[in-house]
Amino acid sequence: MAKKVQAYIKLQVAAGKANPSPPVGPALGQHGVNIMEFCKAFNAETQDIEPGLPTPVVITVYSDRSFTFITKTPPAAVLLKKAAGIKSGSGVPNKTKVGTVTREQLEEIAKTKEPDLTASDLDAAVRTIAGSARSMGLNVEGL
């Protein structure tokens, strides 16, 4: 018999740096999950991702207080800011441009994000990421 799902918890946690402090501790604690067990499992799973990169995770909590989790790829905005070397996007993206990204950088980000994107091929994924870049106030070269 399948376990009964009690809750889904969606968090963004720095890769390899999960610890019991907020936001992880309170979110898991209110559902009775063993926080240290999650932190150790999450850190082990994200050790191959660049440390400190925010990584979305969906935690499924079952009625017997056990859990499973699925890690997603880092948000496109974070990867774009890293590629462009900027701290934050533009407040008025259509008027003020804050940086530039090339098609090669977009392709690299699209390959990283491919498991989470609904794009049918790499070119469609690149166009999706380029749209995110433009809405952040980045110039897109070579597209």
Curated annotation (Swiss-Prot):
GO terms for molecular function: large ribosomal subunit rRNA binding; structural constituent of ribosome. It comes from the Bacteria. GO terms for biological process: translation. One or more lysine residues are methylated. GO terms for cellular component: cytosolic large ribosomal subunit. The keyword Transmembrane helix does not apply. Part of the ribosomal stalk of the 50S ribosomal subunit. Interacts with L10 and the large rRNA to form the base of the stalk. L10 forms an elongated spine to which L12 dimers bind in a sequential fashion forming a multimeric L10(L12)X complex. Belongs to the universal ribosomal protein uL11 family. This is Large ribosomal subunit protein uL11. The lineage of its organism: Bacteria, Pseudomonadati, Pseudomonadota, Gammaproteobacteria, Oceanospirillales.
